[in-house]
Amino acid sequence: MLVIILGVIGLLASSNLVSSSTSTRVGGHLPLTFDPPENELGYWCTYVESCRFCWDCEDGVCTSRIWGNNSTSIVENSYIKYCEVSRWGDQCRYDVEEHIYYTMNCSDPKPWNPYKIARKEWKKNEHFRKDLKKDEF
């Protein structure tokens, strides 16, 4: 009888955990990836916006994959980082290229951007050129 009661309590507890973790904007498990699902980009890029998968870069100018042409374009520099993301239950984790880890509760996300100082907005008349070595003139 005690085993049955404990089993029922365990079942109720686990169903409560499942419903609370799936009520987040992203749900289920996501194995470590450099390329999160397209429908989750808005979530992942809102909280760590310097991840490379958040940006489309061409000729040194990057545009947000989430906000597109309605956002400010930025210069491709050390602000843009390779990130891997994963999710296990209610734990969302970023692994940034220098093996810096940021973990947050998926249901209570907090923005994190230590690279913001490197962000440089692109100005329309700004041109990029490769730094030439002396013998490349």
Curated annotation (Swiss-Prot):
Q: Which InterPro entries match?
A: ASFV_fam_110 (IPR004848)
Q: Which family does the record assign?
A: Belongs to the asfivirus MGF 110 family.
Q: What does this protein do?
A: Plays a role in virus cell tropism, and may be required for efficient virus replication in macrophages.
Domain of life of the source: Viruses
Annotated Pfam families = v110 (PF01639)
Q: Which organism is it from?
A: African swine fever virus (isolate Pig/Kenya/KEN-50/1950)
Known glycosylation sites: N69, N70, N105
Q: Where is the signal peptide?
A: 1-20
Name of this chain's protein: Protein MGF 110-7L
Query: Which terms are listed as keywords in the entry?
Result: Glycoprotein, Signal
